[in-house]
UniProtKB/Swiss-Prot annotation:
Signal peptide: none
An MF annotation (GO) of this entry: rRNA binding
Repressor in keyword set: yes
Gene3D superfamilies, A to Z: 3.30.190.20, 3.40.50.790
Annotated transmembrane regions: none
Gene: rplA
Family named by the database record: Belongs to the universal ribosomal protein uL1 family.
Organism lineage string: Bacteria, Bacillati, Actinomycetota, Actinomycetes, Frankiales
UniProt function note: Binds directly to 23S rRNA. The L1 stalk is quite mobile in the ribosome, and is involved in E site tRNA release.
UniProt entry keywords in alphabetical sequence: Repressor, Ribonucleoprotein, Ribosomal protein, RNA-binding, rRNA-binding, Translation regulation, tRNA-binding
Protein name per its UniProtKB record: Large ribosomal subunit protein uL1
Amino acid sequence: MKRSKAYRAAAEKINPENFYSPLEAVRLAQQTSTTKYDATVEVAIRLGVDPRKADQMVRGTVNLPHGTGKSPRVAVFAAGEKAAEASAAGADIVGSDDLVARIQEGFLEFDATVATPDQMAKVGRIARVLGPRGLMPNPKTGTVTLDIGKAVSDIKGGKINFRVDKQGNLHIVIGKTNFTDTQLIENYTVALDEIVRVKPSAAKGRYLKKITFTTTMGPGIPVDPNRTRNLLDEGAAA
């Protein structure tokens, strides 16, 4: 794959053999962004788990204190009073059978979904569409609930879902390149703490095997997986 001149110039600032601290990686991500807009800062984590085994699945939710820098579009499966509650909370799309039908026809212009329990039989008809995209409502992530207003508000306020893929990789967005160092570090710390907290008891050996920071269309920045504590102190002292 041929890389752009801007990408190659950015990549030259990064030593792929070096492990950077999270603060160094945040600053490099901001410096090596190759887009003309505020790029997304993403973290890719290789976990020491076997996702093929049910007792080693890693998934969860976390509320980023500074959000992701993007207002996610939320689709809600609800009817009656709960539909009105969802709309009042800021849901972008609200529906029931009609929303299911739209999705069956190819509509996917949303970033997250929420559903009331009574709607799940209908949502099940599009599980093969939503599931692979990480968009299926799930009670474990608080997206199948009667408290629709809170669920929508949480997502709009910076709540994100994470789930390890078949290769043992997990991807999370921690903000934009126009965030301050402290905002990105705080988001990263909160997310990483939650990922560590939900480590499966069946997982053996090193859990955090590899961590890489990157920006939209930017080069990867290897981060020391052992630097998981005192990140805020590091940020304050730098």
